[in-house]
């Protein structure tokens, strides 16, 4: 199973939030590029970036930091990014910079047809990010919980060419309370698209549980606060995941 370190960007710095609250940001690094290099050196085979300011503004807000990260590691490992991606022009600009994939979140919920258009324009490069609270999709940087169930939304994207779905349980994100395995597996089994778990990864027991769920469609996991605060040693966790494959 692939473990993917997260680098959340706020005003050019690497931070972690609790439950998506910008006022609950903990700064972990003033140099996101150095952070990216660190995770690469620890054995990361992919990086997950989030433009937090962009998620709220609806347009890219951390381009200098993103460019620095890509200059540091994009030649070695694929980098994906979400946050503020609302149109095809932005997707094209990001891919031209060297990103491997882009993640459509809020725009996928508000306008599912946009996902189909993006997949046609950039085949194989589109990931859908579905963030949920109690199974219901959240949008606009998690500020609004909609009346749409994530499974119903995910099924709409099955034939569009989406390469994966990132499922985040926002009640768990940054809270160190464990991954919501049941909800992640339920989503993975409901669709033909690989699902990446996100939110709440706490320790090696979560890694073992996720690896056990791999045969049921859970293709990987994004980890953030746990690897920054040290409750998970990333290199050790990836080695464990590899040994359980």
Curated annotation (Swiss-Prot):
Gene3D superfamilies in the record: Aldolase class I (3.20.20.70)
Primary localisation category: cytoplasm
Domain of life: Bacteria
Example of a GO biological process term: L-histidine biosynthetic process
EC number from the UniProt entry: 5.3.1.16
Keyword Phosphoprotein: no
UniProt KW keywords: Amino-acid biosynthesis, Cytoplasm, Histidine biosynthesis, Isomerase
Catalytic activity as recorded in UniProt: 1-(5-phospho-beta-D-ribosyl)-5-[(5-phospho-beta-D-ribosylamino)methylideneamino]imidazole-4-carboxamide = 5-[(5-phospho-1-deoxy-D-ribulos-1-ylimino)methylamino]-1-(5-phospho-beta-D-ribosyl)imidazole-4-carboxamide
Molecular function in Gene Ontology: 1-(5-phosphoribosyl)-5-[(5-phosphoribosylamino)methylideneamino]imidazole-4-carboxamide isomerase activity
Pathway noted in the entry: Amino-acid biosynthesis; L-histidine biosynthesis; L-histidine from 5-phospho-alpha-D-ribose 1-diphosphate: step 4/9
Localization annotation: Cytoplasm
Active site: 8, 131
Stored InterPro entries: Aldolase_TIM (IPR013785), His_biosynth (IPR006062), HisA_bact_arch (IPR006063), Isoase_HisA-like (IPR044524), Isoase_HisA-like_bact (IPR023016), RibuloseP-bd_barrel (IPR011060)
Classification via Pfam families: His_biosynth
CC annotations in GO: cytoplasm
Annotated HAMAP family: HisA (MF_01014)
Similarity annotation: Belongs to the HisA/HisF family.
Protein name: 1-(5-phosphoribosyl)-5-[(5-phosphoribosylamino)methylideneamino] imidazole-4-carboxamide isomerase
């Amino acid at each position: 199973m692939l473990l993917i370190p997260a680098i959340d960007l706020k005003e050019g710095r690497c931070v972690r939030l609790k439950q998506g609250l910008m006022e609950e940001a903990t700064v972990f690094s003033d140099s996101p590029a150095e952070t990216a290099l660190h995770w690469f050196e620890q054995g990361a085979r992919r990086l997950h970036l989030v433009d937090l300011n962009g998620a709220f503004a609806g347009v890219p807000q951390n381009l200098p930091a993103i460019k620095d990260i890509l200059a540091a590691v994009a030649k070695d490992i694929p980098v994906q990014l979400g946050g503020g991606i609302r149109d095809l022009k932005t997707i094209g600009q990001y891919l031209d910079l060297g990103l491997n994939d882009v993640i459509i979140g809020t725009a996928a919920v508000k306008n599912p047809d946009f996902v189909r258009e993006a997949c046609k324009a950039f085949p194989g490069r589109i990931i859908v990010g579905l963030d949920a609270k109690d199974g219901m999709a959240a949008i606009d940087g998690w500020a609004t919980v909609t009346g749409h169930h994530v499974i119903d939304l995910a099924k709409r994207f099955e034939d569009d060419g989406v390469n994966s779905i990132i499922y985040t349980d926002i009640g768990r994100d940054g809270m160190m309370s464990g991954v919501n395995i049941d909800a992640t597996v339920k989503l993975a089994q409901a669709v033909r698209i690989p699902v990446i778990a996100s939110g709440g990864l706490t320790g090696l027991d979560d890694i073992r549980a996720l690896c056990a769920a791999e045969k049921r469609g859970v293709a990987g996991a994004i980890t953030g606060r746990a690897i920054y605060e040290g409750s998970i040693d990333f290199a050790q966790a990836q080695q464990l995941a590899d040994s359980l494959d």
